[in-house]
Amino acid sequence: MAEVNRIHYELEYTEGISQQMRIPERLKIASGSSEEPPGLLNASHSTMMLVPERIVIAGDDNDARFGRPRDLDLIQSTPLETVELKTPPRVLTLNDQPLDFLEPEPAANSTAQPREEMKSHFRSRREQCRSENSTMRRNGQINKHDFASPSPSRAPVRVCPPLISPEDSQNLNSASGVLNYIKSTTRRAYQQVLEVLDDSQRGRASLVTFDASVENTPDDAGLTDAASLRRQIIKLNRRLQLLEHENKERAKREMVMYSLTVAFWLVNSWIWLRR
């Protein structure tokens, strides 16, 4: 019975709310001095909304109220020219591709023929000089009439002494010996480099009187010394790397042995104290 009364009460409550409550057509914040005409209240909402015929953009010549912005004139006056872009090559070589390959197409087409001719001319001259130098080396001697002054004697090939001595290899058991070994070998290598540079400068000074075609030939003695010195430096670098690796391994072994020794003495002392 109570449930039926509750349902009946809820129905009456909702019916009273729906009959008495209405949504007002207008909301007034404060009453004004002059009341609006009733015709405006009875007007339809569709007649109050007006859609403009056109939308005026700032800068339109037909509308005098808006001035034309300068940015719009600048954008419209600037011609939109197409920019030509070239795909970069995968490999850049000076022989196949000149340094000024980024020039426009007309300039490149106009100067392509002279460049090819100059390249072919330089290539032929280079090959001719190489062939002449090879023939002169095969003969072993150069004709005296081809030079304004007698040719200087070729510098003898100097053999670089070894950087490693047996005395240094015997003192590699300690850290100080390794440091002394590195210092001595570095000093010897530096002295050999200075000697090679001095010899090359002397050879260049003696070749000043040669002809321009012979000046371009490489110095065999300097090349041999540089190659031997480079090999010795590479060997020294490898030896130093091996020494560093051995020192690291020795340090690890010493650390393990030291920790084991300390642990052994600690265990023995603990056992002795327990007794």
UniProtKB/Swiss-Prot annotation:
Q: Give the highest taxon in the source lineage.
A: Eukaryota
Which stretches are annotated as coiled coil? 223-253
What sections of the protein cross the membrane? 256-273
Q: Name one GO biological process term.
A: protein targeting to mitochondrion
Q: What ranges does the Extracellular topological domain annotation cover?
A: 274-275
Question: Where, in residue ranges, is this chain on the Cytoplasmic side?
Answer: 1-255
User: What topology does the record note for this protein and the membrane?
Assistant: Single-pass type IV membrane protein
Mark out the compositionally biased spans (Basic and acidic residues). 114-130
Q: Where is this region: Disordered?
A: 100-171
Primary location recorded for the protein, binned into one broad class: mitochondrion
Q: Where in the cell is it found?
A: Mitochondrion outer membrane; Peroxisome
Q: Where is the composition biased (Polar residues)?
A: 131-142
What family does this chain come from, according to its entry? Answer: Belongs to the Tango11 family.
What does it do? Answer: Plays a role in mitochondrial and peroxisomal fission. Promotes the recruitment and association of the fission mediator dynamin-related protein 1 (DNM1L) to the mitochondrial surface.
What is the protein named?
A: Mitochondrial fission factor homolog A
Q: Which species is this UniProt entry from?
A: Danio rerio
